């Protein structure tokens, strides 16, 4: 640290430097964190003044605190950028095009913390069926995004090898327990035959989906399900078979869309159902815009959202 009682003293120490000698004292404080410079702090005063030993000690200590805070902020920015890049790389760039079925996915990051969570969606063309997937890994940040990527890859591998829906979820559950004991995730997996409209659905601790029928009636599908993934390797996940008629629309979403302070999840799901019923049979993009409209407009979104 360097302390100059006046700009005249600074000019004497560094002759030839353009200096406004009409202003006061200056304190130049290097910001050092973990033995490396991360910046500098310059304190200016409007008049000449001396710096007592106590003041110099306090200002030097203050510079140390600023350096640590700046270092943490830089690390946070780096980790946040890494997590966002990881998640963007893992979410599908495009969804498969299959005759008779229109699909659309949306993702909104949270506005708190790392801004990146473990929500994901996927649509997988298995050759005979179309697998619709929505999932949510506990937590936020790089770890959640990394776990999400592993689970998404596992689900895709099981699906592309024509595993039954129950086997897909059971296998993913065992994988998560092996990968990270103590971590858990929810998931809903629907295997749809695009020709017959027959769908087989499995739910693991995930919010119930919403179905709009061709006549406009909209309902919450009360799918029996198992516990979240990552808790019990012997957990069972029942399969529900249903038929989606031409013109029907199925909405899968994560809890970030339906959670609000002071309300329970069932109220949130009912809110989504009512919104879908109200807007009627419009293009999927418009439906997604209206369903997520309130969340997109919110300045405080504690959780990320996948639809």
Where are these regions (language model features)?
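… and, occasionally, acidic/histidine-rich disordered N-termini of signaling adaptors
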Residues: 77-251, 289-290, 300-307
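Allosteric cytosolic regulatory segments
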Residues: 60-67
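Regulatory sensory and allosteric helical modules in signal-transduction proteins
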Residues: 1-19
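A short, aliphatic-rich beta-strand micro-motif
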Residues: 24-33, 240
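C-terminal catalytic subdomain
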Residues: 169, 243-252, 257-307
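Short loop/turn motifs at secondary-structure junctions and domain boundaries
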Residues: 17-23, 182
């Amino acid at each position: 640290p360097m302390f100059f009682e006046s700009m005249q003293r600074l000019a004497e120490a560094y002759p030839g430097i353009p200096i406004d000698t009409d202003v006061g004292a200056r304190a130049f404080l290097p910001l050092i964190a973990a033995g490396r410079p991360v910046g500098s702090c310059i304190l200016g005063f409007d008049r000449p003044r001396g710096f007592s030993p106590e003041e110099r000690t306090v200002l030097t200590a203050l510079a140390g605190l600023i350096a640590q805070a700046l270092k943490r902020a830089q690390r946070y920015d780096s980790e946040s950028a890494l997590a966002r890049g990881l998640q963007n790389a893992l979410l599908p760039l495009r969804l498969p095009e299959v005759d008779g079925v229109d699909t659309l996915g949306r993702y909104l990051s949270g506005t708190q913390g790392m801004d990146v969570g473990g929500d994901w969606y996927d649509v997988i063309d298995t050759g005979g069926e179309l697998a619709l997937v929505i999932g949510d890994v506990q937590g936020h940040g790089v770890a959640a995004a990394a776990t999400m990527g592993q689970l998404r890859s596992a689900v895709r591998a099981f699906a592309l090898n024509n595993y039954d829906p129950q086997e897909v979820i059971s296998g993913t559950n065992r994988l998560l327990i092996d990968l990270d004991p103590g971590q858990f995730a929810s998931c809903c997996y629907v295997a749809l035959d695009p020709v017959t409209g027959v769908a087989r659905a499995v739910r693991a601790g995930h919010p119930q989906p919403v179905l709009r029928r061709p006549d406009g009636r909209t309902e919450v599908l009360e799918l029996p399900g198992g516990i979240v993934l990552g808790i019990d390797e012997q957990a069972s996940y029942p399969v529900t078979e249903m038929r989606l008629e031409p013109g029907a629309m199925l909405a899968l979403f994560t809890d970030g869309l339906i959670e609000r302070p002071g309300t329970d999840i069932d109220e949130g799901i009912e809110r989504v159902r009512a919104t879908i019923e109200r807007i009627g049979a419009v293009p999927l993009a418009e439906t997604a815009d209206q369903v997520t409209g309130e969340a997109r407009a919110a300045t405080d979104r504690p959780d990320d959202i996948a639809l």
